[in-house]
């Protein structure tokens, strides 16, 4: 008898967020990966999507050590998020596969872009809802604002004290140098190369 155990990303479906799994039969663990992938827990006020990074990593580790677990099913519904958190989840999935030799499947529901695509990449099989948005492979550092001129017009003077010439890189009150732009671009390029490599 094989039973599917549904584990909500907050753990509220079956077990409390901090409780361990206790199942009497063989099962396939289902992890719902919903919301923006980040290192911290996120709850969205405007939607029901919640993402609990540590909880997901702990459940993968628990199932890796559980002989009754016979595989993982990821239900992916995320726009992606942090490069670090996406990579940490990707590596946890790869480690689960390597140590257990059990199958891992991904079902891309309505959205699996960027980090959602990345965490699905190592899966043995990927299934996609025909209406799912997926892809959007890339890395962004986001928009960096410079409010120096605005503050000057308002009569506000700023002073930045640092211990290194690039320590204040990205500071909203200082102009970015060509060297700083190259440094930031190299960080984005490195993350992208890891993503597609």
Q: Where do the model's predicted regions map?
A:
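Small-residue-centered hinge/linker elements
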Residues: 1-102, 111-197
